[in-house]
Regions:
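Conserved N-terminal phosphate-binding loop of PLP-dependent enzymes in the Aspartate aminotransferase
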Residues: 1-366
Length: 366
């Protein structure tokens, strides 16, 4: 907040395309240096996560001269029109809004139960044979950890195969790090866990600690494929957001939040795993996730895998009554995601977990 207050006293708006300013340039340079790929990088800023994914697709299309985009079932990429088309969940993101932009295709995401990495890749090759030639695909977009889709971690084997397929066919690989980026998974970017290098990276949310700022980090030659003025926006990369973004990077380093995320994740997973073993509570899955990006499913029965469809919203409502904010996710609406602030104390984390445990006990008796 101190960084934002100082920037507020200097200036709040110029529009970067009209008059460049230091916070934008400084933040872009720092992100270029931390880009999760080798070679020269460039960064452009926007306002929302949906803008980031839309513009990443625009960059990929400009660089390749192709139109097709492949996304994953269960993925979430925003609420703008193209971002809604990329999103792999019908309700509430698609159904009411009519025809969405075309040349967007979806393949299944591995779920550790019914769909394997091999299944996903088989469907990708089937797509190439049945619906769109790989020579007409501009990009494949994937979340290293699906957010709205249920905190399902993209297997390293899948990411490596996608990278190889993209290299073979000249397709650009987009990592949507809007929810998984900036220390949440124990790395600055979630895809770094796999060692796979994307071509474009979408960023937002924790980038500026909640201030409206998003962006795309990309290989320089791709970013340069767009003509001047082709990307941007009146409020894109606003000075207050950039000042906040610079402070966020400093805090991640100073407070060792990468280590904190890993330690917090271990604490969360250990506690949730203990619930999984108990028969006096609602049946839940084992926890999953990377770092402090952790979730579990509410199940129909103990030792099963079938999710209790739609029950997540009920549990979240109960938690709110007890003073805890939770969010459900997953295609079945039965997944509880835990996104504790990385700056929260262990005592506060335990207090929240105590509330969840109490609800799971009470609902089992209801």
């Amino acid at each position: 907040m101190d960084a934002v207050k100082k920037q507020l006293d200097r200036f709040t708006h110029t529009a970067f395309q009209v008059s460049a300013y230091e916070p934008y340039i400084e933040l872009a340079e720092k992100l270029n240096a931390r880009a999760p790929f080798s070679g020269d990088a460039k960064t452009i800023f926007f306002t929302t996560g949906g803008e980031a994914t839309e513009n990443a697709v625009k960059i990929a299309r400009a660089a390749t001269g192709r139109n097709g985009v492949i996304a994953f079932c269960g993925g979430f990429h925003g609420r703008t029109l193209l971002a809604s088309a990329l999103t792999g969940k019908v309700l509430p993101y698609k159904a009411p809004f009519g025809t969405l932009p075309g040349e967007v295709y979806h393949i299944p995401f591995p779920d550790n139960h019914d769909i394997t990495v091999e299944d996903s890749l088989k469907m990708l090759h089937f797509l190439f044979a049945a619906d769109i030639s790989p020579n007409n695909v501009a990009a494949i977009i994937i979340e290293p950890v699906q957010g709205e889709g249920g905190f399902r971690v993209a297997p390293t084997a899948l990411l490596k195969q996608l990278r190889a397929i993209c290299d073979q066919h000249g397709i650009k690989l987009i990592a949507d790090e809007v929810q998984s980026g900036f220390a949440r998974t124990g790395k600055l970017f979630g895809i770094e866990h796999s060692g796979v290098e994307p071509d474009l990276v979408c960023i937002a949310k924790s980038l500026a600690g909640g201030f409206p700022l998003s962006g795309v980090i990309g290989r320089a030659e791709l970013m340069d494929s767009v003509p001047p003025g082709g990307l941007g926006g009146t409020y894109a990369g606003a000075p207050l957001g950039c000042a906040a973004g610079l402070a966020v990077l400093d805090i991640i380093e100073e407070e060792k939040l990468l280590d904190r995320a890993n330690n917090m994740g271990e604490r969360l997973k250990a506690r949730i795993a203990s619930w999984h073993k108990r028969t006096d509570m609602l049946p839940i899955s084992m926890p999953r996730g990377l770092g402090a990006m952790v979730a579990f499913d509410i199940l129909e029965r103990h030792a099963g895998v079938e999710q209790r469809k739609g029950f997540g919203s009920k549990l979240c409502a109960r938690a709110c009554e007890k003073g805890l904010i939770l969010l459900a996710c997953g295609v079945q609406g039965a997944t509880i995601r835990i996104l504790t602030p990385l700056t929260a104390s262990d005592e506060l984390v335990d207090e929240g977990l105590d509330i969840i445990e109490q609800i799971l006990l009470e609902e089992a008796k209801a």
